[in-house]
């Protein structure tokens, strides 16, 4: 029996990413987390697009990132909306328009790499509301969960065996964006103590 560390690391990271859904939802229910509706619904749609585009070029452990993210963001978005905990601002409308524009451009091209790039651009446009919200209120997002998410996605990237732009672009972008949000949550906690 061969020991394939890629499989073990990928499986462990996938379990971690799935497990993070529960404490995040608990933090929404307890009102300690106030998610941006635009970000979470936008992420659900865009992760689904990235999953399909990435899968069209081959299935690898890195596919777990957009696939699990599609599932988790959809659950979180509907939970926040149902409980009335979702935050909505006028700037979110601009981000929605930019996201729709990027999705439209992807639909016109139908090329997987272009789809991934446009989904990253659209993702950034729906991530901005969460970045702004977290900058303004660092306690509105749970630091530990964002750090664990970064660790999980990074582990998925390390577990990949196909180091191509198709398999790495979106997960690496996700690591960077999530690390920014995590850093903002810590920034607020450190300044609050000072």
Residue ranges and their predicted role:
Residues 1-194:
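Alpha-helical membrane-protein topology signature
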